Curated annotation (Swiss-Prot):
Pfam families xrefs: SIR2
Keywords, comma-separated and alphabetical: Cytoplasm, Metal-binding, NAD, Transferase, Zinc
Domain Deacetylase sirtuin-type: residue ranges: 1-243
Protein's gene: cobB
EC number per UniProt: 2.3.1.286
Name the UniProt record assigns to this protein: NAD-dependent protein deacetylase
Transmembrane intervals: none
Length: 243
């Protein structure tokens, strides 16, 4: 492990066009449940009596707008979550002009909360909401502080600005993410299994010098990586910062 940390530090220190690609493992330490792992959010959602895929779908929003927004308030707001050391480390490297930014599969908004400016949120963010009818925009604070569920303009359901099942990923976001990967000299994957498509398929477009994967479990890209560390992200970053 010590040798891996030394290698990681050397690569990071010698790179000036780092792109980060993050998944659920990065935010677990902030109290955000992993969606798909055992005991994760999907397991919790299943207790509500409907499938997680349906509850997080465009169909459910259209079939039962009231049920959908009640579900969002109960399961998705993550009111007390704060960025952890991994989010802070990524933001610091961007401030130091070593990083092109971060591409994330997460919807928690914690990269932006940590100060990262160049964030491509592939699946949207819970920091923004909008009316499903008239599209008036709301911030997360509006929804939480006022327990706001219906638009004060037209009465429509206020939904989070996330990609639901049955909806397409935002194409401008995909293009920006692809450019970040293609322009990077080092691509650092943190806390992602790299199996959720089409987002994970973006990794195959990396042509730079170093692919680094830090994840508890193996990924389909491990054999292509310069460095693979199967460990907890927080532990790795803490150790890296004391090297």
């Amino acid at each position: 492990m010590k040798h891996d940390l030394e290698t990681l530090k050397h690569i990071i220190d010698s790179s000036n066009r780092i792109t980060f690609f993050t998944g659920a493992g990065v935010s677990v330490a902030s109290g955000v449940p992993d969606f798909r792992s055992m005991g994760g959010l999907f397991d919790e959602i299943s207790k509500d009596g409907l499938s997680p895929e349906y509850l997080l779908s465009r169909d459910y929003l259209e079939d039962d707008p009231e049920g959908f927004i009640n579900f969002c308030h109960k399961r998705l707001l993550f009111v007390d979550t704060m960025p952890n050391i991994v989010h802070d480390w990524i933001a610091k490297l961007e401030r130091n002009q070593q990083s092109l930014g971060v591409i994330t599969q997460n919807i928690d908004g914690l990269h932006s909360d940590a100060g990262s400016q160049h964030v491509d949120e592939l699946h949207g963010t819970l920091n923004r909401f909008y009316c499903n009818a008239c599209h008036k925009s709301y911030m997360k604070s509006d929804v939480i502080d006022r327990t706001l569920k219906h638009c004060d303009n037209c009465g429509g359901a206020i939904r989070p600005d996330i990609v639901l099942y049955g909806e397409m990923l935002d194409q401008p976001t995909i293009i920006r993410a692809l450019n970040k990967i293609e322009d990077a000299d080092t691509l650092v994957v943190l806390g992602s299994s790299l199996v959720v498509q089409p987002a994970a398929g973006l990794i195959s477009n990396f042509k730079g010098d170093n692919l680094i994967i830090i994840n508890k479990d193996r990924t389909p890209y491990d054999n292509d990586a310069t460095l693979v560390i199967h460990d907890d992200m927080v532990s790795v970053v803490k150790s890296l910062m004391t090297e």
